[in-house]
Amino acid sequence: MRIALDAMGGDHAPGEIVKGAIEAAEELHLQILLVGRPDAIEPLLKEASAGARSRLDIVAASEVIAMDESPATALRKKKDASIVVATRLVKEGRAQALVSAGSTGAQMAASLLGLGRISGIDRPAIATILPTLEGGKLLLDVGANSEAKPRNLLQFAHMGSIYAEKVMGIANPRVALLNIGEEETKGNELVLGAYGMLREAPLHFIGNVEGRDIFFGRADVIVCDGFVGNVVLKFGEGMVSALKTMIKDELKNSRMAQLGALLAAPALRGMGKRLDYAEYGGAPLLGVNGVSIICHGSSKAKAIKNALRVARQGVQQNFIAAIQEHIPGKVEPVC
């Protein structure tokens, strides 16, 4: 198995990206194609052991799509951009998955154009794993579609359910619709329409959940449009960051608190690990005809290593084939 890694994408590229690739090659024994400028990548590989270096190959790409560039315009003008070349490697079968911490819009567009949509899927969705009291749970869409139709949410639910079962190992995953109340009569036109479709679909649909339910792990797959999902995701990131700052501030102001923190250090480290997005790697772009993993733009080595692990799991569990097999037959009769 080979995974194409966009070495030039992200706030900390190429240094942290290549470092994450080296760690993945050493610890996970992955074969990785580093896509980008050889003159920028090659010097960084001196840190790799001989075994890891043998699993890392460079594929030249002379251009980079910046975060603030228009994805459509950039893809037309920059045919040799690292994300374009990495996607092409998957399309041609030279790699089995794609990972990037670069422009999300560019990766979505490149994946759609290069890999195509799975038959029966109208729009792809970005799915992310959220830490909850019951372990990691899947939220989608978190940014691919700021607007959606009930039919799209139904398709997201099917894809999310398959991914949760195949890749996350959750048997008969509970699917819920994110809403402003638990009652089926609440919500806007989108949510009300989706509720009726989900209720009739061959899914383990448990109804609506509210925002306060998400982190208690009440559902395994939570479905919403990309606007709402992105707000939830960014709110969660901000809340975790604020809580960490609050704890540090309180510790500075109290010697007793500092003593307590020493005693509670193992528990605090465990909590920090559970809340660290880097532990979960990247978010799969579900609905495209290939494994495409989107990483946070500020990803460092640990996040990249874990994103490569997620990509490997996706390929090994063959969730793309599962979606291809189940989606058309399940979705069409309902709509």
Curated annotation (Swiss-Prot):
Keyword terms of this UniProt record: Cytoplasm, Lipid biosynthesis, Lipid metabolism, Phospholipid biosynthesis, Phospholipid metabolism, Transferase
Compartments it resides in: Cytoplasm
Enzyme Commission number(s) of this protein: 2.3.1.274
InterPro entries in UniProt: FA_synthesis (IPR003664), Phospholipid_synth_PlsX-like (IPR012281)
Catalytic activity: a fatty acyl-[ACP] + phosphate = an acyl phosphate + holo-[ACP]
Pathway recorded for this protein: Lipid metabolism; phospholipid metabolism
Any one GO cellular component localisation term in the record: cytoplasm
GO biological process: fatty acid biosynthetic process; phospholipid biosynthetic process
Transmembrane segments: none
Presence of keyword Zinc: no
Pfam families the UniProt entry points to: FA_synthesis
One Gene Ontology term of the molecular function aspect: phosphate:acyl-[acyl carrier protein] acyltransferase activity
UniProt keyword Transferase, yes or no: yes
Function: Catalyzes the reversible formation of acyl-phosphate (acyl-PO(4)) from acyl-[acyl-carrier-protein] (acyl-ACP). This enzyme utilizes acyl-ACP as fatty acyl donor, but not acyl-CoA.
Assigned protein family: Belongs to the PlsX family.
Listed name of the protein: Phosphate acyltransferase
The organism of origin for this protein: Heliobacterium modesticaldum (strain ATCC 51547 / Ice1)
Phylogenetic classification of the source organism: Bacteria, Bacillati, Bacillota, Clostridia, Eubacteriales
Chain's gene name: plsX
